[in-house]
Amino acid sequence: CALPIYKYVYLMDIAGEVTMYYNIEIRNPSGIKIGKGTIIGENAILDGRAGLEIGNNVNFSSNVRIWTLQHDYRDPDFACNPEHYGPVKICDRAWIGPHTIILHDVTVGEGAVIAAGAVVTKDVLPYTLVGGGPAKQIGIRPRGLRYEFHGGHPKFL
């Protein structure tokens, strides 16, 4: 299990009962905090260069990409642009669908759902369902969610 490597060698802040599937790419692990009972699906990219905070009982499907920093296509050196730089926060019990991209300076509210393939460029309100590129609200989710994940999935890292 590689979780101790992330936690103790790379100084990634990981709470208990977190499940991380295979082939996850981590950028600046010391800038990432993952809450209790969160599941990170396979082939995820987690970018902690500008800070990434993931709440409790968050479900990441496969192939989720979170970018806290972007290069400037106009810069002759392809340098990172301070205008395209900022932390991402995913609040408790959010559900991130497969092949989703979440860009810098975004907060995904508690209980929010991001549909498969969405490109999230702006904050997502709590208990809303968003989809598309760029993501827009397409529904709402009931409040009062009680589910908790307790780890132990057979394919964890």
Predicted regions and their residues:
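Short, contiguous, helix-prone interaction/anchoring segments in small proteins
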Residues: V9-A15, I26-P29
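Short, small-residue-biased leader/transition segments that mark boundaries at the very start
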Residues: C1-L3
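Flexible, glycine/small-residue-enriched loop-and-beta-strand segment within the central core
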Residues: I24-I34, I39-T107, G133-P134, G139-F149
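Conserved G/P- and acidic residue-centered "switch" motifs that form tight phosphate/ATP-binding loops
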Residues: I114, G132
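Intrinsically disordered, low-complexity acidic/proline-/asparagine-rich linker or regulatory tail/stalk regions
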Residues: F149-L157
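Conserved catalytic segment of ABC-fold P-loop ATPases
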Residues: G109-A112, L125-Y127
